[in-house]
From Swiss-Prot:
GO terms for molecular function: GTP binding; GTPase activity; translation initiation factor activity. Residues 300-468 form the tr-type G domain. This is Translation initiation factor IF-2. Residues 409-412 are annotated as: G4. One of its GO terms (cellular component) is cytosol. Residues 334-338 are annotated as: G2.
């Protein structure tokens, strides 16, 4: 029995009914044992892995030892009994002599068509002619089965050293030589023998090996890394309660659960490393290019200064004072909602300024501004002091490892206290120079212009003292996209900051998922420029789509190369987005949620004028916390006007369209009115966040509140064949109303709940309500267990809106 199982398991995967036949039982019994072991099979025809077969045989022997013994007792002994009866007629010396005495001219054994046993291992004796046929044929005709069973005898098999004509059965008729297994096959068999069995499949254990995967990788990608079939990994995921397909993008948490189950460790490659590997596959190595620059190639470049701080502390007004413009009046709500990049002249030198939003929703924008800057100017209002976004901007500047200059603004206002600002900043390890530190504090008034020249001088002094600002202007351009938008007449327009090299009109560029040839470049004043050296911000036209703020841009040699890089980035970003939006749902939770209808979601489409504002709005909405019952799904986001395709998508997915500083075209407006799509427009970001939060709370199921209506004491109990048990009551408080919900209370304990006042009478009249101080007869439907002294409490369930 055991040999049959092991032998069959190694050669192929046996069916369940075959294993049941070997064990002498039925398939139903084995299916029950497999269910207890945690292995689930669909039918008796299901194939089993060898380790599962071994565990099943062991479990069956432990559970049904009597059947195993009975199987052993009824095993037929025929092969064991008949085998020793064959040897007596053919003594061993004669066989040995026959092998040696075959003449060279004799016909080859096995080729005689009249021989009764061609290919057998026994030979005729080489005695006289009269003896040989009689003796050989008599034995051969008598017991052919016995002589056939003597074939595996050890002596004839060992005495066959001659290859050509020694042993019968040559030319493929006898015993074939055993092929030696390769080391790889032996190692695989050994690994599979010790491999764990999960969900009915066998997967080699990883023993802690680290597997690197890209964001948004699929089960197929993981399977290729560890050299197993994707179907096996899907079986393991299903065993763990996860539903997925072979090509579906999974999140990091799902990969960690899967890898831990089979003995691996998963490391998700960061987006920067992933993009670096992508560029290197196209022979673009940014680090190597910077290393190749010699000292003679480097030239001095202007410093890049980012103005940061809390909202309404005067950052944009300060920049307007420096530039002699009025940017603040153009921003909705009086707050900056875009990143602005400008270059101004200070004497005979240039300084590039980047203005970042101060509102809390624009954290990502401030982080990007800190990464591309050389110096951070931290604006703090002298009357407000340090605020939350002030601390956040300080953290961004420190994480970017850039020097800081503190501008204490609004010193012209009443109640301004610059000394207090300096003392508060020391609590965050920002020590002014007058206190013995290394940070310059400049008192300014952006409104009157007081101290602005001193601030510019402090910026240049910091740049000369702490930084070595040089770049190679003679190579292909590299930089970063500061902001991007979709212009009605110009198409996709991106504000880029050149960090090295020189960007020229006609260059082939790729930034994020957008690519194209630079058709035109203009500066911050709208004047056309032909080239942009390092630290120069320009607006670029000619891109295929709107890139995201913060995307790096590079110049490549061919249009085809730019398109391939952009398409590959778009595919990676799509996979990462799918993995991010995928919610891990167990089988039980998924089924239960559908049955109970607990899943509610608000689908949204966000369109904005610039990509940075769309990103900030999306990030702020994702942080809204309104409980687990309601989810927010952003099914599409983009830059530009609201189009008819956006309305069509909202119609299909029952979504709300949010327009941030954009409007729908005529077709989209008509389609939205016809389909009843909710389209909302905002120009200030926190207005949008507040309205959407209220909408999400409106999706929440109202809280149910129980209100007490009245209490009655049972004085008498009457029984009626028509209406059942009737309680004669005295109303103690409130009122008793017909059809009201009620509960029966006895000695302070609720005896019966969820009752209804089915009948209510006062004397012989049916009434709808009996107030406190009066007596009445109360019927509680089929409830008959009513005793004198019980209390009947009526209640009302009301819906209470969520706070």
């Amino acid at each position: 029995m055991g040999v049959g199982l092991c032998g069959r398991g190694i050669v192929a995967k046996p069916r369940l009914y075959e294993v049941a036949s070997d064990l002498g039982t039925d398939s139903k019994t084995l299916m029950g044992i497999l269910r207890e072991m945690g292995e689930f099979v669909k039918s008796p025809s299901s194939a089993l892995e060898p380790p599962v077969v071994r565990k099943l045989a062991k479990a069956f022997a432990e559970k049904y030892p009597d059947k195993v013994e009975e199987k052993k007792e009824h095993t037929p002994p025929a092969p064991v009994v008949e085998t020793p009866k064959a040897p007596p007629p053919l003594p061993r010396p004669i066989i040995r002599h026959a092998v040696r005495g075959v003449p060279s001219g004799a016909p080859r054994p096995g080729n005689n068509p009249y021989a009764p046993r061609q290919g057998m291992g026994q030979l005729a004796t080489p005695g006289p002619a009269t003896k040989r046929p009689v003796k050989f044929k008599a034995e051969g005709d008598k017991k052919p089965a016995s002589t056939h069973r003597r074939v595996p005898a050890p002596l004839p098999q060992k005495r066959t050293p001659l290859r050509g004509r020694g042993a019968p059965g040559a030319f493929g008729r006898g015993n074939k030589p055993k092929s030696r297994k390769s080391k790889t096959l032996k190692r695989q068999e050994f690994e599979m023998r010790d491999a764990p069995v999960i969900g009915g499949v066998t997967i080699p254990r990883g023993d802690g090996r680290v597997i690197r995967l890209m964001q948004g990788a699929s089960v197929t990608d993981f399977a290729e890394k560890i050299d197993v079939l994707p179907a096996n990994l899907l079986s393991v995921l299903f065993h763990l309660g996860e539903m997925a397909t072979a090509t579906e993008s999974l999140d990091e948490a799902t990969f960690e659960i899967l890898a831990e189950e089979i003995g691996y460790k998963v490391q998700i490659v960061s987006p920067d490393d992933e993009d670096r590997a992508l560029l290197e596959s196209f022979s673009v190595n940014l680090a190597a290019e910077h290393a190749e620059d010699s000292e003679l190639d480097l030239a001095i470049r202007p410093p890049v200064v980012t103005i940061m701080g809390h909202v309404d502390h005067g950052k944009t007004l300060l920049l307007d004072t420096i530039r002699n413009t009025n940017t603040l009046a153009e921003e909705s709500g009086g707050i900056t909602q875009h990143i602005g990049a400008y270059q101004v002249s200070v004497g005979d030198r240039f300084v590039t300024f980047i203005d970042t939003p101060g509102h809390e929703a624009f954290t990502a924008m401030r982080a990007r501004g800190a990464k591309v800057t050389d110096i951070a100017v931290l604006v703090v209002a002298a009357d407000d002091g340090i605020m939350p976004q002030t601390i956040e901007a300080l953290d961004h500047a420190r994480s970017a490892d850039v020097p800081i200059v503190v501008a204490v603004n609004k010193i012209d206002k009443e109640g301004a206290n610059p000394a207090k600002i300096r003392q508060q900043m020391t609590e965050f390890d920002v020590i002014p120079e007058e206190y013995g530190g290394d940070v310059m504090f400049i008192d300014i008034s952006a409104k009157t212009g007081q101290g602005v020249d001193a601030l510019l001088e402090a910026i240049l002094l910091t740049a000369d003292a702490a930084l070595e600002l040089r770049a190679n202007p003679d190579r292909t351009a590299r930089g970063v996209t500061i902001e991007a938008k979709l212009d009605a007449g110009r198409g996709a327009v991106a504000t880029v900051l050149v960090q090295s090299g020189t960007l020229r009109v006609g260059d082939r560029v790729v930034t994020g998922c957008a690519y194209g040839r630079v058709r035109a470049m203009v500066d911050e004043n709208g004047l056309p420029v032909e080239s942009a050296p390092p630290s120069r911000p320009v607006r670029v036209q000619g891109l295929s789509s709107v890139p995201k703020a913060g995307d790096s841009f590079i110049v490549v040699a061919e249009d085809r190369q730019a398109r391939q890089i952009a398409e590959k980035r778009e595919a990676n970003e799509r996979n990462a987005q799918l993995a991010k939006s995928r919610k891990r749902v167990s089988l039980e939770d998924f089924t239960r949620a559908i049955q109970e209808g607990r899943v509610q979601s608000l689908n949204m489409i966000i369109k904005g004028d610039v990509s940075g504002a769309v990103e900030a709005l999306e990030e702020s909405l994702s942080k809204l916390d309104v409980g687990e019952e309601v989810s927010l799904r952003i099914i599409h986001r983009g830059v530009g006007a609201i189009t008819e395709s956006d309305v069509n998508l909202a119609t299909v997915d029952n979504a709300v369209v949010i327009g941030f500083n954009v409007r729908p075209d005529r077709k989209a407006r008509d389609r939205a009115a016809r389909e009843g799509v909710d389209v909302r427009f905002y120009s200030v970001i926190y207005d949008a966040i507040e309205d959407i939060e209220k909408s999400l709370k409106g999706l929440l199921k109202p809280e149910l509140e129980e209100r007490k209506l009245g209490l009655a004491i049972v004085k008498e109990v009457f029984h009626s064949s028509r209406v059942g048990t009737i309680a004669g009551c005295s109303v103690e408080s409130g009122s008793i109303t017909r059809n009201a919900k009620a509960r029966l209370i006895r000695d302070g304990v609720v005896v019966v709940n969820d009752l209804t006042v089915t009948s209510l009478r006062r004397f012989k009249d049916d009434v709808t309500e009996v107030k406190s101080g009066f007596e009445c007869g109360v019927g509680l439907g089929s409830c008959d267990d009513i005793r004198i002294g019980d209390e009947i409490e009526t209640i009302q369930i009301v819906e209470k809106p969520r706070a």
